[in-house]
């Protein structure tokens, strides 16, 4: 594995670790009342930084590869994901609620989010490899979440989320 591939895999590992821990536990500065906005902003931040870092790494790897060879290397699942994003784009353009369809109103499930899901799928499918330590990170985050939930059920307010 060359240096660029290792860098891309490391960047993917960091992104996955943050999504499996910090993103799951993030409540934002305003408590539960604005948790959706806080999580969405964190999702955008982590994902855009990851995409930029992965793109820089990928550009170093594919500089010398012919475009035809790249197209032949696309897997069927990747074509399907690209088709899904393209259909979502077409649906957004043809929607009578086009202005709302870009971000997706209050739940933020619009074209931007769907396109980022597609990009994440494509990048992680190519750059990430399964690792046991990522399960440990996820397990630790979920254990902490469960402990906080039990504390709250017992009447505590450990994170100061309630007024």
Set out the residue ranges of the language-model regions.
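Structural signature of hydrophobic alpha-helical transmembrane segments
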Residues: 44, 107-114
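Mid-sequence acidic-hydrophobic segments that form the walls
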Residues: 114-121, 126-130, 150-153, 157
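Transmembrane signal-anchor hairpin modules in multi-pass inner-membrane enzymes, especially those
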Residues: 1-96, 101-105, 119, 123-140
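Small-residue-rich segments of transmembrane alpha-helices in multi-pass membrane proteins
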Residues: 117, 141-146
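Membrane-interfacial helix-loop-helix modules of multi-pass inner-membrane proteins that assemble, modify
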Residues: 92-101, 144-163
